Regions:
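Hydrophobic faces of well-ordered beta-strands that scaffold small-molecule active sites
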Residues: 6-10, 29-31, 58-62, 94-96, ...
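N-terminal amphipathic alpha-helix/helix-capping segment at the start of soluble metabolic enzymes
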Residues: 1-11, 51-52, 217-220
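Glycine-enriched alpha-helix->loop->beta-strand junction motifs that scaffold or abut catalytic
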Residues: 24-29, 54-57, 90-93, 116-120, ...
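Active-site-adjacent beta->alpha loops and helix N-cap segments on the catalytic face
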Residues: 16, 35-56, 74-77, 98-118, ...
Length: 249
């Protein structure tokens, strides 16, 4: 990789997304399910097929549910088993985050998952963005041996969090990678890179795909109260990924 190249990680909600992202030139993918909930653990079948079909690295999400990051003992047990299974089935890394009820990092539980990850990449996700003391939290992650932190700079989107992201990158040095992610689009890529000096970015690149199998009874819905169209779903857009990669050359 060229020294000044910006690494592009595409957030994917399915193996189909990951394959399209790779075709478009992505350097790495984050593999999840349920992106509407912020990303949950993908199925083991997805991870097995990802290992068989992808040439680029993929980082598997381990998150048992939406709605926060303070987990019960039962949820923690599931996360530990998912981490072991994802590693055994070939994931290049694990992305996760566990907080205490006050929003601080649950260091004891994070260390348990970190130990199971072993020599694979350990990534702390945007749970970081609700921690009360970002620099204390970053010190904890460094001490635990995390590879990388995904963050929007404790704001809703990266463009809003640019000042903190820049400070985090400067503070981290070469002790941990800082990966800006959240609200990055084709039109603001350059702004993010120039304002922060980041060496990698994390974003989605979707288009709408139709599934006509439900058109016969359009009044039947399967989702929650928002009732998204049942004949549509989002899939990674290979051409948009290629534009993103091309913009950063």
């Amino acid at each position: 990789m060229a020294e000044n190249k910006i690494l592009v990680e595409i957030c994917c909600g399915s193996l189909e997304d990951a394959i399209e992202a790779e075709k478009g030139g992505a350097d790495r993918v984050e593999l999840c399910s349920a992106l509407f909930l912020g990303g949950l653990t993908p199925s083991m079948g997805t991870i097995v097929e990802a290992k068989a079909r992808l040439k680029i690295p993929f980082i598997a999400m381990v998150r048992p549910r939406g709605g926060g990051f303070c987990y019960t003992d039962v949820e923690m047990a599931v996360m530990e088993r998912d981490t072991v299974a994802a590693r055994e089935h070939g994931a290049d890394g694990i992305v996760f985050g566990i907080l205490n009820a006050d929003g601080s990092i649950d260091e004891a539980r994070c260390r348990r998952i970190r130990k199971l990850i072993g020599d694979r990449q350990a990534v702390f996700h945007r749970a970081f963005d609700v921690t009360p003391d970002p620099f204390r939290a970053l010190d904890q992650l460094i001490d635990m041996g995390f590879t990388r932190l995904l963050t929007s700079g404790q704001e809703d989107t990266v463009p809003e969090g640019l000042p903190l992201i820049k400070r985090l990158i400067e503070y981290a040095g070469d002790r941990i990678e800082i990966l800006p992610g959240g609200g990055i689009k084709l039109y603001n890529l350059r702004q993010v890179v120039e304002a922060t000096g980041c060496k990698q970015i994390h974003l989605t690149a979707f288009k709408t795909q139709l599934d006509l199998s439900v058109r016969g009874r359009p009044f039947v819905t399967f989702g929650g109260a928002l009732y998204p169209p049942e004949d549509q779903f989002q899939v990674a857009d290979q051409s948009l990924v290629a534009q993103i990669v091309g913009t950063l050359k």
